[in-house]
């Protein structure tokens, strides 16, 4: 589709590899510009406290799907939000052996659950958390409603309250 052949693809990959030392400074500039514009930024798959700290220094205050407890604790300890995938909860763990969302939730280190690649998972995750007794229903539902709204700064939604944007879904316990 790009109209290139294997030789030009290889040349492009080699050129990008040769410029890899430019990446940190480019990220610094990009993050500074986005922060100046008020854009919420998140890191993905943080593995270490040090790596999480580098992102935080750039103004990146959301840690999405940290891969280790160390990275999640570093984010939480610095006041950054930790977001995990609802499918991780539904499956009972990470699909690739990384950190379990259930573990972070039980430690109070997860601020929000995201649908990730499977839109039915937030509802299922909240209900599973409540049924398991790990959280009460209100606490479990907050991870898929008010939690995501808060971490994204969406103060006009996330709770059922006068003047706020909201959708309401009625769930039948029997089904």
Where do the protein language model's features map onto the residues?
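His/Asp/Glu-enriched, well-ordered alpha-helical/loop segment
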Residues: 78-88, 92-173
């Amino acid at each position: 589709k790009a109209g290139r052949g294997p030789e030009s693809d290889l040349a492009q990959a080699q050129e990008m590899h040769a410029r890899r030392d430019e990446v940190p400074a480019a990220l610094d500039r990009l993050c500074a510009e986005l922060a100046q514009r008020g854009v919420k930024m998140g890191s993905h798959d943080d593995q270490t406290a040090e790596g999480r700290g580098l992102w935080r220094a750039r103004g990146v205050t959301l840690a999405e799907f940290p891969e280790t407890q160390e990275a999640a604790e570093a984010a939480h300890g610095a006041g950054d939000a930790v977001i995990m995938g609802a499918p991780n909860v539904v499956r009972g763990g990470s699909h690739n052996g990384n950190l379990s969302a259930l573990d972070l939730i039980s430690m109070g280190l997860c601020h929000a659950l995201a649908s990730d690649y499977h839109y039915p998972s937030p509802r299922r995750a909240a209900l599973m958390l409540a049924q398991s007794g790990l959280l009460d229903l209100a606490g479990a539902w907050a991870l898929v409603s008010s939690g995501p709204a808060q971490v994204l700064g969406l103060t006009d939604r996330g709770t059922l309250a006068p003047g706020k944007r909201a959708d309401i879904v009625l769930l039948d316990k029997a089904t």
